[in-house]
């Protein structure tokens, strides 16, 4: 293994560990000392990769957005109708047997309000990631009109953003209530809203 590969793996280990901690405790709740302890690395190693905690936060969000969109692209390019792909995406927000759903792992849900006030650079990264996701959802809405599985909307882009906002709200309510009921309601409402039979 080359030194560059080892360096890349160590950096990724810090980001992966940081993501797990931030999902649980929030960005402000994770100090560098705790991160170093969890990663079992010296302080110098952290500052070799990241100039500051804010720089670490930016890298963490860039890594998260890239990973998230890559998984979405895989899902959205699978075989099947546009409606089936959208239904699979929304259903993935709910916890399934043996695994957590997207809602519990979503850094937009966890950090959106926090980083918007904390770091302009981090806010921009998350906002750009949301824009790219919404664009993908809007594309599937258009595809669904073409394949006859999704009703036609006057403004697919606005509809996609509205649907994503609905799911963010449902995810926050699910965290507050510690139940999946808000997500289940969002799934039922979204399915009804998209159906070409409910025009």
List each model region and its residues:
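Helix-turn-helix
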Residues: 13, 20-55, 59
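Small-residue (primarily alanine) positions within well-ordered alpha-helices
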Residues: 17-18, 39, 144, 160
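C-terminal peripheral helix-coil segments that are non-catalytic and often amphipathic
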Residues: 88-96, 131-143, 147, 157, ...
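N-terminal intrinsically disordered/low-complexity leader segments
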Residues: 1-9
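Amphipathic alpha-helical segments used for helix-helix packing
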Residues: 85, 100-121
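Generic hydrophobic, amphipathic alpha-helix propensity
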Residues: 10-18, 35, 60-64, 68, ...
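Short, solvent-exposed amphipathic helices
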Residues: 63, 74, 121-132, 139
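Hydrophobic alpha-helical connector segments
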Residues: 59, 73-104, 156-163
């Amino acid at each position: 293994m080359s030194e560059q590969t080892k360096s890349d793996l160590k950096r990724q280990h810090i980001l992966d560990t940081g993501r797990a901690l931030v999902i649980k405790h929030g960005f402000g709740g994770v100090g560098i000392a705790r991160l170093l302890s969890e990663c079992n690395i010296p302080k110098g190693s952290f500052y070799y990769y990241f100039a500051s905690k804010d720089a670490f936060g930016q890298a963490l969000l860039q890594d998260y957005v890239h990973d998230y969109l890559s998984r979405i692209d895989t899902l959205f390019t699978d075989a099947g109708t546009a409606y089936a792909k959208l239904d699979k995406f929304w259903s993935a927000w709910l916890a399934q047997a043996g695994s957590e759903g997207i809602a519990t792992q979503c850094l937009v849900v966890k950090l959106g309000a926090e980083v918007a006030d904390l770091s302009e650079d981090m806010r921009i990264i998350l906002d750009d990631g949301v824009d790219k996701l919404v664009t993908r959802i809007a594309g599937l809405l258009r595809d669904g009109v073409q394949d006859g599985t999704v009703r036609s909307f006057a403004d697919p882009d606005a509809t996609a953003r509205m649907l994503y906002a609905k799911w963010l709200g449902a995810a926050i309510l699910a965290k507050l209530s510690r139940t999946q009921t808000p997500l289940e309601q969002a799934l039922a409402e979204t399915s009804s809203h998209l159906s070409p039979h409910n025009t």
